[in-house]
Amino acid sequence: MNTYLLITSIVIFLCILLNRVSNRIGIPALLAFIVLGMLFGSDGIMKIDFDNYAFAEQICSTALIFIMFYGGFGTNWQRAKAVAVKSVLLSTIGVIITCFITGLFCHFALNMSWEISFLLGALISSTDAASVFSILRSKKLNLKYNTASLLEVESGSNDPCAYMLTVAFIAVSQGSASPGNIAILIVKQLAFGIIFGVLIAKLSIMLLRYIRFKSAGFDAIFMVGIALISYALPAYFDGNGFLSAYIVGIILGNTEIENKKNLVNFFDGITGLMQMLIFFLLGLLSFPSKLPHVIVPALLIFMWLTFVARPLSVALVLTPFRSKIKQQLLVSWSGLRGAASIVFSIMAYTATNDDLDTFHIIFMIVLFSILLQGSMLPWISRKLDMLDKPADVMKTFNDYSEEADIQFIQLTIPENHLWCGHKLKDLTLPPETLIVLIRRGEQNIIPDGETIILQNDVLVLSAITPDEVHGIRLVEKIIEKDSRYNNKLLSEISKKHNEIIIMIQRNGQVIIPNGNVRLTTGDILVINRAVN
């Protein structure tokens, strides 16, 4: 056992190291995890003989539960609502179109059987949220036309549909499925997945509001239990557990939950670990000696998928919405294949004993996708003029504050402010704060003591990040159209004695509240409630 623990720790450390190296040289980290697995595998340097596909399927399926759950939990529904219809159509109709177009190519061009052709189409019909957003975030790419939200919802929600198609075509390839059985399977998958997802989410919200966790970290453990049961319960009744996990995640993620920021950080780490696990196992299970036999069909399928099937499905779905051509091209290119395709391919490999090596074909397709699509995504975004340059000067400061023990705030000097017309050296600032930048129109000024503050100056102040703050519990409240707070001034609202509104988010902008601010539909109030 000690040997296994030692190897596991070494693999984790190497994955973290490779993640840092890959970010510097511009290669997606997930590709590095695959290569590391290959080096540890039976054909690699470490010669670890591991070919237990059934065991790997169980591990990877469990890992995918957390990836699906967090995919929903991290989705900002307020921002995603504008593209929800397009995203859902891409994640359902788009997946089906991709599956069938790819299946037709495999049958007629590669002379595969109908069953295996459509099974391969199902395995690679969904896109990978983790792959896309690890690249967008590491390269700090902001996309125009709300494309980031579109990709987030689509890639987070299309795995359940791909899973349903995979299960259906596995049954077909086994010869145990009739049209009636397939119809019943699809109905049960959708019905139990949606029903259990909503019920578990609502029950979880009730429990989270009733239970007060006395020990730090128990709320995260409780959420792990929710994620697991959100998959296991519907799956027990032949429902779509991945769909249920995603629904539970998206409902809980957009509900007022205590300590949500820490939960996000926790699941961010868990999801990162699950990605390492899945892609490392993919490399470990593979036999590089078998890859030359599948590289040609895998490359042909990848090219067809990338340049025909995916663009055609995107065009059929987005053109009726009059989406711009360059947005459609970027969405098409962003269809990276990853974790879900790997897990489903292992599932198919264990369930079907076909002569064709479906696992290594999917392995090569994922490899091509991450290497080519992933590496070129920033370049494609620039060439299509889809980068939305940040208008807010604070973006750079926020990026820096993630790595240093310092935070930045900004304030605009209004007319008749006490600081107007005064030199910096004559101002009385709060203790341990410093004005580090003044933005005056289009000019950025590094101030000194002789700098004079003018009306409409935007001041950026730095302050030390606290190690730990006690007594603060932040919750969010969304102002709906029928809310009794809608269209009222803050001064007209009666508040509890132990809470204060510290921030209002409106159309992507942050408003520091005062009594003269009037609330409107869609406002997100960030409230601090005292903790005793």
Language-model features, listed with the residues they occupy:
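Transmembrane helical cores of multi-pass secondary ion antiporters/exchangers
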Residues: 1-390, 403
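Cytosolic regulatory regions of ion transport systems
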Residues: 312, 318-330, 340, 344-532
